[in-house]
Amino acid sequence: MVLDNLGSSLRGSLDKLRGKSRLDEDDVQEIVKEIQRSLLSADVDVSLVMDLSDSIKTRALEEEPPGGTSARDHVLKIVYEELVDLIGESTEIPLESQTIMLAGLQGSGKTTTSAKMAWWFSKKGLRPAVIQTDTFRPGAYDQAKQMCERAEVDFYGDPDCDDPVQIAREGLEATEDADVHIVDTAGRHALEDDLIDEIEEIEGVVQPDLNLLVLDAAIGQGAKEQAQQFDESIGIGGVVITKLDGTAKGGGALTAVNETDSSIAFLGMGETVQDIERFEPNGFISRLLGMGDLKQLSERVERAMSETQAEDEDWDPEEMMKGNFTLKDMQKQMEAMDKMGPLDQVLDMIPGFGGGIKDQLPDDAMDVTKDRMRSFEVIMDSMTEEELENPRKVGASRVRRIAQGSGQDEETIQELLEQHRMMEQTIKQFQNMGDGDMQRMMKKLQNQGGGGGGGMGGLGGMGPF
């Protein structure tokens, strides 16, 4: 994920404080320099870096850590609070009728973002419509139409019209029954006068309640000038940062937020319409520092399980917590995991895992895990309903038959059965837990997250990895 290098670098800087109970000025100076290097290498604006590091240095030297708090955890808390303050609050997005206009350069991800946002609003119970006004880029209409079909939301565009202002006007009329209108505008390879003139004309017609600037996370220092010009032209009320699943540094996009005195509204991190989330500064910085984000994790789990259950109404996820945990349940869990997004993003949300442990994994660990899950899915697709419902009936002869039918080796099938047994045992432990036990476990997870290292906190065996 983008900013992973920044997060890893910051965590590495803080880990140098392990074992220290108190800090002297040399310790603080060294850690501040490390933080400065981390932020500057991620393309965060120099003036922002200096202001942030000055605040961290002052607080680290002047504030007394609470009793029992290590020097590392004290500085971690300060860095967390200062980064949250730097990014600011999330853009307010009311769940009511409104018109939102997207602006940005060509290739920033506006068209994809418009469909993703429409999908997000639809999941909140509103009826959104995307109005595609980009007549400059070949294929813009087709791309927008296809993505809106995948998102199952209303769409308006006119491939035969070359007047974006007319399309915007007619689009509002054609989609008047929609609650939320999302107007996608054209971009250019650079900020040209005709782009600014066009977007100002469209704004005059649609009268948006909110203008969002869409920025590619890879934009770097160029984000500052781009943000300034769009803000002067139409006024930017919020920013959407896209392509967060890439390897870009991301600091330039964060700089643009500060430059426009706005805030971040959404984060885009994949190619499907579901790969979008509302920006929550506390959770975002928490993930960055390896502390997890249980709120976002629970939202993704709830959505994924709900969608999986809707596809198979005979399957009830609550039943597996009451009775036998079958391979069918495991299969459905894996389908739900696929819907939660890239595995590395999900792991970032688990306190104590996203930082310390994930940093130590081999570079290909995520790919290996995904390949293993794919193999498990192929194996289960080759099983009979009886075998899925009663894994204990899968003996040696059945293993050989399943291996032939799935094209997988017998060892991988045995791994699947062993993984199922581990998950079954873990679920039985949950069945025997009272509310107090569950609360203590979650508190333990949070504490491990605060330390940035920790382990899986008992979650090993809860999934096929």
Swiss-Prot record:
Localization annotation: Cytoplasm
Annotated signal peptide: none
Domain of life, per lineage: Archaea
Keyword field contains Nucleotide-binding: yes
EC number: 3.6.5.4
Annotated positions binding GTP: 104-111, 184-188, 242-245
A GO CC term attached to the entry: signal recognition particle
GO terms assigned for molecular function: 7S RNA binding; ATP hydrolysis activity; GTP binding; GTPase activity
Keywords: Cytoplasm, GTP-binding, Hydrolase, Nucleotide-binding, Ribonucleoprotein, RNA-binding, Signal recognition particle
Oligomer status and interactors: Part of the signal recognition particle protein translocation system, which is composed of SRP and FtsY. Archaeal SRP consists of a 7S RNA molecule of 300 nucleotides and two protein subunits: SRP54 and SRP19.
Entry function: Involved in targeting and insertion of nascent membrane proteins into the cytoplasmic membrane. Binds to the hydrophobic signal sequence of the ribosome-nascent chain (RNC) as it emerges from the ribosomes. The SRP-RNC complex is then targeted to the cytoplasmic membrane where it interacts with the SRP receptor FtsY.
HAMAP family xref list: SRP54
Descriptive protein name: Signal recognition particle 54 kDa protein
The species this protein was found in: Haloferax volcanii (strain ATCC 29605 / DSM 3757 / JCM 8879 / NBRC 14742 / NCIMB 2012 / VKM B-1768 / DS2)
Gene that this polypeptide is encoded by: srp54
